[in-house]
């Protein structure tokens, strides 16, 4: 690529439940649509927009395991809370996340990308893999609060408290206990 060309980019990890079927337990679909809008805006302003879709369903644990985790979250004593978000995955799957992001930037290198002006991602694993592969990142774009579904508040609060990038407020331990998802009967 040409160094003067501005690039907006999202590497999106597959989420059939949200991306395809519209589940609101996570922020995947709103983040994907927000990224597409950001990429279109970048292209309309003379730059390039790129969304790469990675087949890493359910943090690379697979769809069945992801749905087992969702079930455990909704059925746990006290309900689905942000302070237990990662613990439920670890309890069901033995790990919090199986994604190996170190090879993910290969698709960017294949396109000749040496810098990303606007990385539409809150994931530090993706950011670290991209910058660690020699691609410079200018600005990180988080998901605006108004796009976060109510039931996904559990996910986003847990992730930002765990260190995911945000330009907003990082919830403390009390707020994590209060962030509660929809129950089984609602």
Residue spans for each PLM region:
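Catalytic domains of riboflavin
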Residues: 1-186
């Amino acid at each position: 690529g040409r160094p003067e060309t501005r690039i907006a980019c999202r590497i999106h990890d597959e989420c059939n439940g949200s991306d395809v079927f519209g589940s609101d337990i996570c922020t995947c679909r709103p983040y994907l649509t927000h990224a597409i809008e950001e990429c279109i805006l970048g292209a309309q302003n003379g730059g390039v927009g790129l969304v790469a879709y990675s087949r890493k369903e359910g943090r690379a644990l697979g769809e069945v395991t992801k749905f087992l985790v969702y079930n455990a979250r909704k059925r746990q004593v006290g309900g689905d809370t942000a302070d237990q978000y990662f613990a439920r995955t670890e309890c069901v799957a033995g790990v919090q996340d199986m994604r190996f992001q170190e090879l993910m930037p290969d698709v960017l290198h294949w396109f000749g990308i040496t810098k990303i002006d606007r990385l539409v991602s809150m994931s530090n694993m993706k950011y670290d893999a991209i910058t660690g592969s020699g691609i410079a990142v200018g600005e990180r774009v988080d998901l605006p609060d108004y796009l976060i579904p109510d039931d996904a508040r559990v996910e986003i609060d847990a992730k930002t408290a765990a260190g995911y990038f945000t330009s907003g407020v990082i919830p403390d331990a009390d707020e994590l206990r209060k962030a509660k998802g929809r129950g089984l009967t609602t």
